[in-house]
């Protein structure tokens, strides 16, 4: 990453299920500029916000930056991919509108399984890709409703390619 990371980065969440909503919600709760790609849950979250019941303290975000397409979100500093790996074939079409004109946009995968970081590196270059492992127990209760039972630690690493 050639440019310094901004103090208040613009963050896109791709895959707004339990993992994406929990970590994106925590980032938004602490003042970050977080934008969620939402499809089926869009209208519910737009109207009622994001509700997180957590062992670390419940919170509600009444206003959420939710979008139906990545083109609506536009360029970001960080893209967090938290969708199921079975949908990875959609990523080469979803991520480009989120990338800036230079190499500064980073892509962090918080997906289950192996190979997601390699796939992203092949598509967008290894210098942009970070791998993440989530040690957390969470569940999506319904549209805009997440329950966090335990832990929440994330380990990060640069792509080795």
What kind of region is each of these model predictions?
Residues 150-161:
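Conserved anion/nucleotide-ligand pocket segment
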Residues 41, 113, 152:
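A generic "binding-loop/recognition-motif" signal
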Residues 14-19, 23-24, 48, 112, ...:
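Short glycine-rich loop/turn motifs that provide flexible caps or phosphate-binding loops at active sites
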Residues 60-147, 155:
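Rossmann-like NAD(P)(H) cofactor-binding subdomain of soluble oxidoreductases
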Residues 4-5, 146-149:
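Solvent-exposed alpha-helices and their adjacent loops that cap or buttress functional pockets
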Residues 2-58:
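NAD(P)+-binding Rossmann beta1-loop-alpha1 motif at the extreme N-terminus of oxidoreductases
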Residues 39, 85-86, 159-161:
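Short, surface-exposed acidic/glycine-rich loop or hinge patches that mediate macromolecular interfaces
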């Amino acid at each position: 990453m050639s440019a310094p990371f901004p103090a208040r980065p613009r963050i896109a969440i791709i895959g707004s299920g339990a993992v994406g909503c929990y970590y994106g919600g925590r980032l938004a709760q602490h003042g970050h500029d977080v934008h969620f790609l939402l499809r089926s849950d869009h209208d519910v979250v737009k109207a009622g916000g994001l509700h997180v019941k957590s062992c670390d303290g419940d919170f509600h975000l009444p206003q959420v930056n939710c979008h139906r397409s990545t083109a609506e979100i536009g360029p970001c500093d960080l893209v967090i991919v938290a969708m199921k790996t079975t949908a990875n074939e959609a990523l080469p079409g979803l991520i480009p509108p989120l990338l800036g004109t230079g190499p500064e946009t980073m892509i962090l995968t918080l997906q289950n399984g192996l190979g997601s970081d390699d796939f992203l590196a092949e598509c967008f270059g290894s210098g942009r890709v970070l791998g993440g492992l989530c040690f957390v127990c969470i569940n999506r209760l319904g549209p805009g409703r997440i329950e966090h039972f335990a832990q929440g630690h994330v380990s990060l690493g640069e792509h080795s390619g």
